């Protein structure tokens, strides 16, 4: 079969895996209130809002997911060096990362909540910890597995010159940054502040005054992930999937059109610049359209 067709197929599969990984990563962070909304949940008890959110301030998402995916990649790489089947190696590596993820989540939750118990009266709800841990580890496993699979395709099918653990580290940092900047805003700036008028942002005076009541009963992280699965999670997956697909596509296009190595690299760089400029222009037009369509925010 034509190597170019094989590369295109591997790229499409890698982009699909990255899309699933991005969605799962964002929903996992929503269950655990990590990154963007974490500081608001942290301030809740200080504002008199005793909550039942799972609050795991391990670190920012880029750092934590860089750790998880790199640990999974290093484990899988070592197992593949021992002639284990690549799929099994990726599964075992993702399982190791899930164990690390779960351990950090429990220690971060208990440490953060216990630190607020004495001064602000925030109880440590053990049922919250046990009920949220499964979705956190499960979504994390899916995200790490898909990212590690995409990294494996990048190294073995798309000709990436770097070793698997390093590519996995880069993918983990990238998806964490996208989840923190794209998907978590849907939770931290909207879901936690639904009692305030939409579009008003989060004034300093309102920080920590989070919603603690759901449509029925008391709100928790599982409610938040359900809400964010409608927009924030899919947007994160779409953003990460497009980054992986377009980045690989420009390299393949350079290999098809170019002759020598320098020409191929130059074509790939030019195509990448065209994609970035086109994206900037589209973002600007969408922003201007939205502002003209819905008008400025007022406090009426």
Swiss-Prot record:
Functional pathway: One-carbon metabolism; methanogenesis from CO(2); methyl-coenzyme M from 5,10-methylene-5,6,7,8-tetrahydromethanopterin: step 2/2
Enzyme class per UniProt: translocase
Catalyses which reaction(s): 5-methyl-5,6,7,8-tetrahydromethanopterin + coenzyme M + 2 Na(+)(in) = 5,6,7,8-tetrahydromethanopterin + methyl-coenzyme M + 2 Na(+)(out)
Keywords noted in UniProt: Cell membrane, Membrane, Methanogenesis, Methyltransferase, One-carbon metabolism, Transferase, Translocase, Transmembrane, Transmembrane helix
EC identifiers of the protein: 7.2.1.4
Primary location class: membrane
GO cellular component, one term: cytoplasm
GO process terms (BP): methanogenesis, from carbon dioxide; methylation; one-carbon metabolic process
MF terms in GO: tetrahydromethanopterin S-methyltransferase activity
Sequence intervals crossing the membrane: 62-82, 86-106, 135-155, 158-178, 226-246, 261-281
Origin superkingdom: Archaea
Annotated membrane topology: Multi-pass membrane protein
Pfam family, one: MtrE
UniProt xrefs under InterPro entries: MeTrfase_E
Localization in the cell: Cell membrane
Function (record text): Part of a complex that catalyzes the formation of methyl-coenzyme M and tetrahydromethanopterin from coenzyme M and methyl-tetrahydromethanopterin. This is an energy-conserving, sodium-ion translocating step.
Family: Belongs to the MtrE family.
Record note on quaternary structure: The complex is composed of 8 subunits; MtrA, MtrB, MtrC, MtrD, MtrE, MtrF, MtrG and MtrH.
Protein name as annotated: Tetrahydromethanopterin S-methyltransferase subunit E
């Amino acid at each position: 079969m034509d190597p170019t067709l094989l590369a295109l197929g591997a790229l499409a599969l890698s982009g699909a895996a990255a899309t699933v990984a991005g969605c799962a990563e964002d929903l996992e962070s929503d269950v655990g209130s990590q990154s963007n909304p974490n500081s608001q949940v942290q301030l809740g008890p200080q504002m008199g809002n005793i909550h039942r959110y799972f609050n795991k301030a391990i670190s920012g998402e880029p750092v934590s997911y860089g750790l998880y995916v790199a640990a999974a990649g290093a484990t899988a790489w070592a197992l593949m060096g021992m002639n284990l089947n690549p799929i099994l190696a990726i599964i075992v590596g993702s399982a190791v990362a899930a164990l690390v993820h779960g351990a950090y989540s429990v220690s971060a939750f208990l440490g953060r909540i216990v630190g607020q118990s004495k001064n602000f009266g925030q109880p440590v709800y053990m049922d919250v910890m046990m009920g949220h841990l499964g979705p956190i580890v499960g979504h994390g496993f899916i995200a790490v597995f898909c990212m590690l699979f995409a990294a494996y395709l990048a190294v073995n099918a798309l000709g990436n010159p770097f070793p698997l653990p390093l590519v996995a580290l880069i993918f983990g940092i990238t998806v964490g940054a996208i989840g923190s900047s794209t998907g978590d805003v849907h939770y931290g700036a909207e879901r936690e502040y639904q009692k305030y008028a939409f579009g008003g942002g989060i004034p300093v005076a309102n920080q920590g005054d989070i919603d603690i009541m759901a449509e029925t009963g008391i709100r928790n992280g599982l409610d938040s992930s359900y809400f964010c699965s409608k927009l924030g999670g899919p947007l994160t997956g779409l953003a990460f999937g497009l980054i992986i697909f377009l980045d690989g596509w420009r390299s393949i296009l350079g290999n098809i059109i170019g002759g020598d190595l320098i020409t191929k690299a130059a074509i790939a760089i030019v195509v990448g610049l065209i994609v970035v400029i086109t994206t900037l222009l589209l973002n600007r037009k969408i922003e201007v359209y939205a502002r003209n369509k819905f008008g400025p925010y007022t406090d009426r």
